[in-house]
Amino acid sequence: MELGLVGLGKMGGNMRERIRRAGHTVIGYDRNPDVADVHSLEELVGKLKGPRVVWVMVPAGAATQSTIDELAELLSPGDVVVDGGNSRWTDDEKHAVELGLKGIGFVDCGVSGGVWGLENGYALMYGGDAENVAKVQPVFDALKPEGEFGSVHAGKVGAGHFAKMVHNGIEYAMMQAYAEGWELLEKVDSVTDVREVFRSWQEGTVIRSWLLDLAVNALDEDEHLDRLRGFAADSGEGRWTVEAAIDNAVPLPAITASLFARFASRQDDSPQMKMIAALRNQFGGHAVESKK
């Protein structure tokens, strides 16, 4: 089949290559002319035969909204837009309504796989009407990992991005658990080879995982992570997961704590701990440390 792909960055560029390897035609557009196949969205749409499928792989928020707005004016009834970026699931219904007024279908798709997806395939979670999903199915089949699993029609519009959001929340908590275990192992004198302890966990243990494999890779490159600063950004999906939990009265202690740990990583000196130190001094005369 033919596919229009908007956004050819680290993810989009590799996705274009994987889809082409499966025998499909991909016409890609990106603001960077060095990687684009066409010079504009209008040219991209013009090169596709109807019913068209256009996959949007640009940053969430304003960039996605402006791309969908432009496609709404260029596409025809029966065409389908897929949002494969990390959009907030609450935006999906809005996009579906906007496009639906012009007879254009909409599918949201959460994509996981990162820079490894080109060779290993991408895990896909998508939401939308069955009729629209069917038009995109050959692309889903090309992108997914080999085998029975790795993709799912999660439900109606918004379900794909919601599932990906929860996936990322779980990822936050798993990474935090590995990080806490690593720090404790590094702290004690009795454990003399933390890296090899992590490596030993890769086979036969209940905590083996791809994230653990990546942790071992990182320790092979920098055994004590001395070259790194302890600073971790958050993409936004961890926050959205916690907000969704609040909205639905679902307890999420591990994921919430992992998000707050990232906030703490950005502080050179904790204002909260200053207040706690001051209070301990006030009520108990406990010693405080002054700035040097």
Description of each model-found segment:
Residues 1-52, 78, 115-117, 281:
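NAD(P)+-binding Rossmann beta1-loop-alpha1 motif at the extreme N-terminus of oxidoreductases
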Residues 22, 102, 248:
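Conserved dinucleotide-binding and phosphotransfer motif residues
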Residues 26, 106-107, 252:
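Hydrophobic beta-strand scaffold residues
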Residues 31-94, 100, 118-128:
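Rossmann-like NAD(P)-binding element
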Residues 67-69, 88-188:
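Rossmann-fold dinucleotide-binding core
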Residues 125, 135, 158-286:
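Helical "substrate-binding/catalytic lid" subdomain
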